[in-house]
Amino acid sequence: MSADFGLIGLAVMGQNLILNAADHGFTVCAYNRTQSKVDHFLANEAKGKSIIGATSIEDFISKLKRPRKVMLLVKAGAPVDALINQIVPLLEKGDIIIDGGNSHFPDSNRRYEELKKKGILFVGSGVSGGEEGARYGPSLMPGGSEEAWPHIKNIFQSISAKSDGEPCCEWVGPAGAGHYVKMVHNGIEYGDMQLICEAYDIMKRLGGFTDKEISDVFAKWNNGVLDSFLVEITRDILKFDDVDGKPLVEKIMDTAGQKGTGKWTAINALDLGMPVTLIGEAVFARCLSALKNERIRASKVLPGPEVPKDAVKDREQFVDDLEQALYASKIISYAQGFMLIREAAATYGWKLNNPAIALMWRGGCIIRSVFLGQITKAYREEPDLENLLFNKFFADAVTKAQSGWRKSIALATTYGIPTPAFSTALSFYDGYRSERLPANLLQAQRDYFGAHTFRVLPECASDNLPVDKDIHINWTGHGGNVSSSTYQA
């Protein structure tokens, strides 16, 4: 029996993706470096399905239909390169290697170029949705060698999640574009999770809500504009009790881990000069949470305001305001994410399909939500939309949410409740809508101490301050008039 495609890596994600493909009528060849894993999988979960095993890499390759389609679901980094180097000598020109792991997009760029020279087609595909998504329909974000797409399109779109009947999978773009979009997806995921945690913290510490009451609030929100996977699971987590009848969430150490994809997004935003502030703050919030011992010490020596029992006088209005704050901040997070994708496309020379990207995230993935349907609609109406905030639906939504957004942050700040993600979202919004920012003074400072020059406003131009010219002023009368390009502030 020949397989439609093969998959290497039989951890839970790999097994579930194979089972998903078999359910959709595809024959899959499974391989793992530990043979016992293959044997156990074939004898149990895969029994009776169109799944075959292989005893070696050579045996694995020999069982694939041409062009061979090899999907890797192994740990990102060196293991991917090692496996590719092992497989390539056994392949022919036109065969396809698909990396479905959480690889960093520069690695995918490199692999794309290296394999291109050897005539091998490379696809770097983001896979989102966790174990359940892999089994019943993930969000898939493939990019790389576009010649590979006709050969894998039917498989990928068949096994992917569906939203309103459309597959949550479409070709993203060349080189590492697929893994880039997955990286931004993960960064937005960081932001969404942090915003939800801040809403939980505000309700608990400021409103005195119990976990069950907060769960009820999230349940209500999940029936409205905030309907999403993360709000849904938060509802479930907060009502889950341990064996002693107490909320399990209260027993969990308040130190958050991270695998690095949020950090990658924040660093890339800095590299491209994009103010993706919310994802950055979400990453730093996790870093701060890791300083548990220092925070315990600081809590004993650094004073702050006490929260009075009557801090929240109208619970219903308080919850409504907080819902608006969460909704508006979420809009900012996605606006920033798509700003970054837009800039990446321009910088890296990629032609990316924003409506398709939004649709891919509409179902099957961790950030899936009803909200993404509006983003898909916005980009379908205007594919070159500069910013989501210029779309009438989102502009109106933020305008309507402003009052509750500002009140929630002001109240939390008054009583010392940290809101890094909420606050940076609002600061970005206020900065973005400001025709004039204080960067004029900043640029004057740079010119004063480093001769970095500045430009004048067209309406302020004169003979000594010409328009569209880099100008340096001798601010003290003691310096020179030579512009510096070596000392940067």
Swiss-Prot record:
Which GO BP terms sit in this record? cellular response to oxidative stress; D-gluconate metabolic process; pentose-phosphate shunt, oxidative branch
A Pfam short name: 6PGD
Domain of life according to the entry:
Eukaryota
- Where NADP(+) is bound, by residue? G9, L10, A11, V12, M13, G14, N32, R33, T34, V74, K75, A76, N102
What is one cellular component GO term in this UniProt entry?
cytoplasm
- EC numbers listed for it are 1.1.1.44
Q: Where does it localize? A: Cytoplasm
Annotated residues for binding of substrate: N102, S128, G129, G130, H185, N186, Y190, K259, R286, R446, H452
What does this chain do? Catalyzes the oxidative decarboxylation of 6-phosphogluconate to ribulose 5-phosphate and CO(2), with concomitant reduction of NADP to NADPH.
PANTHER family, alphabetized:
6-PHOSPHOGLUCONATE DEHYDROGENASE
* The protein, known as: 6-phosphogluconate dehydrogenase, decarboxylating 1
Q: Which gene encodes it?
A: GND1
